[in-house]
Amino acid sequence: IRKVEKKIGFNISKKQKFIEYSPQAVKYLEIIAQKIKSNDGGILIIDYGYWEEKMKNTLKSISNHRFNDVLKNFTKADITYDINFRLLENILKNSGLKINGKNNQKIFLENLGINKRAEIISKNLPFLKKVDIFYRLKKLTDKKMMGEVFKVVFATNKNINFQAGFINWLNLENFLNLNP
């Protein structure tokens, strides 16, 4: 366990009942981080997952947009797991990157102005097309759909400071306390 802890930069409790991580994913993430460091780049990761300290079993099987038994349908289904964003954050930091921002998808997209964008593009559309746009918007941002299930993390080289999506630019004056 100590070897795994050192590799992933994550303390595994003795009470931990489940250890879920992909050595191959860690390896690829470290390679990507080194490329970012040497080229002054960044990485934006958006996926479903969780921020908790404790690892948990999130292995699941999905077929025809429905969850099913991993062992009963594995040849005809997508097998996946939730990303442990706390672990991901530790790997990125241990690779020398700076975490510039982290949020759930709802806040991230709203900070980028997705609601205003939906209003603008739907302004002159027929009613049914407007309904479709706002249904899709709800799916992306509603906390019961993708809004809180999906997480966003942005990591860059130490000398880059980019905050789009992580600061509410529409209310920047309030953020900076410019309005008394």
What are these model-predicted stretches?
Residues 3-180:
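Long, Lys/Arg- and hydrophobic-enriched amphipathic alpha-helices
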